[in-house]
Structures are given as C-alpha cells and as structure tokens.
Regions:
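Conserved phosphate- and dinucleotide-binding cores of soluble alpha/beta proteins
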Residues: 11-12, 18-208
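Active-site nucleophile and cofactor-binding loops and adjacent substrate-binding regions
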Residues: 1-5, 24-26
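Glycine-rich loop(s) and the adjacent beta-strand/alpha-helix scaffold that form part
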Residues: 7-9
Length: 208
C-alpha cells in the first residue's frame, strides 16, 4: 500500500498495479478525488488513527519507505521541520515525526534556500532525531546515515553522487558562506513534543 496525500502519480501507480491500495489522508489534485470516488482500493483514513502513536490503527511504522521534507538537517542527521534557519516558526509538525518510524526515511532538501545553507552544524530546532533519518538527497549530492551500513553497501558501486553529510555542509558553506548564529531571548514561544509527549526542544523568541 501507499500512504497519501494522493495525486495523479500515486493514482497511476495504483491503477498500473504497482501498489494495491492507497490509504489516503488528503487529496492534492482532481485525479486523487476521481480515484477516491471510483476505486474501492483508494481508502480514506484519518490522521488521528493512522499517525497516532497511541492508536491501534497506527500504520506509519509499517511503511517501507517514506519521503518527507525538512527546513534544516545537521551533520548528525537531526532534522528541523518547524522553524526556518532564521528561528521563526513556520507551521505545525503534523504527522511528520510519526512517519520517521518507517523502515527507510528519505529527506529530499535543497542544499541551500535564499543563500542560507540547509545542511548545518546543528539544527535550529530539533524535531526528528538523526537515528531515525536515513538518507538526505540534495541537488548536489546524497548523504546516507553511517548507521545504515546496509544502504551504504548496496549503493557502493553505483553511479549515485554519494557524499558524507559533512561534505554536503562544506559545499553549502563554500557557496553561501557560514551562516551567522541567531540571537534568541529567554522567552519560550513553543515546545516541541515527541510522539509520546516527551518535550525534546523548545522554540525561543528571536531577538529583534
């Protein structure tokens, strides 16, 4: 099965027999809407069950591969999805953390945004621990978490542009320069909870 948000590409995969079911939480285009209307195997699901760590319907950890976004990744493969590199809040985390329990987690990210490196020494806000993030894909190369020796072995003799995460960070800094550190006040404006409710980081107010 594939977990949606669905779009025409996911629908085509199901209709061509590449996946048997789409378990959908939202549709991103009219092809997804059409498929949900016409295909019995295109099933509506609620994120309150499918992504809920405490729910019997939670299937996020059953997924073989998940592809997610991130605003920052650091050299320890920790990821940020809730603030930008300027320290300001972007949006909520949603089911992003729950998806990290998939067998392989891939984060496709640009190496930099608006001349600001995305691969950094330390993320501004910790949302996902590096031990759950397996592959970083950028337009200038791919980094595989050293803990995933199986993936490193399988890609050893491939033509893929594989680098260490440190090499990607250095590439970003050679183009953009090393970013200045943000000045924060002591005021806490948000808490970052892990899926079990544990607070793993906080967001502090940016000094004007």
């Amino acid at each position: 099965f594939a977990r949606g948000g669905s779009n025409k590409y996911l629908v085509e995969m199901m209709e061509e027999g590449l996946v048997e079911y789409i378990l959908d939480g939202q549709t991103f285009d009219l092809e997804g809407v059409r498929s949900m209307r016409e295909n019995a195997n295109h099933v509506w699901t609620s994120p309150f069950t499918s992504y809920n760590y405490h729910s019997k319907g939670n299937f996020a950890g059953l997924v073989d591969v998940v592809v997610l976004g991130a605003t920052e990744v650091d050299v320890n493969f920790n990821a940020n999805v809730v603030t930008h590199s300027d320290g300001y809040l972007l949006h909520g985390i949603g089911g992003w953390q729950n998806c990290l329990f998939a067998k392989t987690t891939i984060l496709p990210i640009p190496l930099f945004r608006d001349r600001i490196p995305v691969v950094v020494d330390e993320v501004t806000t910790l949302c996902g621990p590096g031990e759950l993030i397996d592959v970083i894909v950028t337009e200038r190369g791919i980094a595989i978490n050293p803990k995933r020796t199986d993936l490193i072995e399988k890609t050893k003799n491939s033509d893929l542009p594989i680098y260490s995460i440190e090499e990607l960070k250095e590439e970003a800094e050679s183009i953009c320069g090393k970013p200045q550190k943000i000045s924060f006040s002591d005021e806490v404006v948000a808490a970052i909870n892990w899926v079990d409710g544990t607070v793993i980081d906080v967001v502090r107010k940016v000094k004007e």
